[in-house]
């Protein structure tokens, strides 16, 4: 999994909603520093946090993970 791509997608979805990292971390009940580490690609979220992020941001897991999983290259 490409942690940096996952982090960029979480960051983009958060910004589209007009939220700060502090706001999203409050909604997901996680530490703002941990969220910033996820968004920078330094950390991978736990499954529980990943699900909470998807629900809060109203995005599918596929949106956040597409192209970051092994074998996800387009099949022409």
Please give the residue ranges for each predicted region.
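Short amphipathic helical patch at the helix-1/turn junction of helix-turn-helix
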Residues: 4, 15-16, 44
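Short, charged recognition helix plus adjacent turn
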Residues: 16, 55, 63-76
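Recognition helix of helix-turn-helix/homeodomain-like DNA-binding domains
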Residues: 29-44
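Short, basic-rich loop-to-helix N-cap that marks the start of a DNA-contacting helix
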Residues: 42-55, 73
């Amino acid at each position: 999994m490409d942690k940096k791509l996952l982090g960029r997608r979480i960051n983009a979805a958060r910004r589209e909603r007009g939220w700060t990292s502090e706001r999203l971390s409050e909604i997901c009940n996680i530490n703002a520093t941990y969220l910033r580490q996820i968004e920078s690609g330094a950390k991978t979220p736990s499954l529980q946090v990943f699900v909470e992020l998807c629900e809060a941001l109203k995005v599918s897991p596929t949106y956040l993970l597409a192209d970051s999983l092994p074998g996800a290259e387009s099949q022409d």
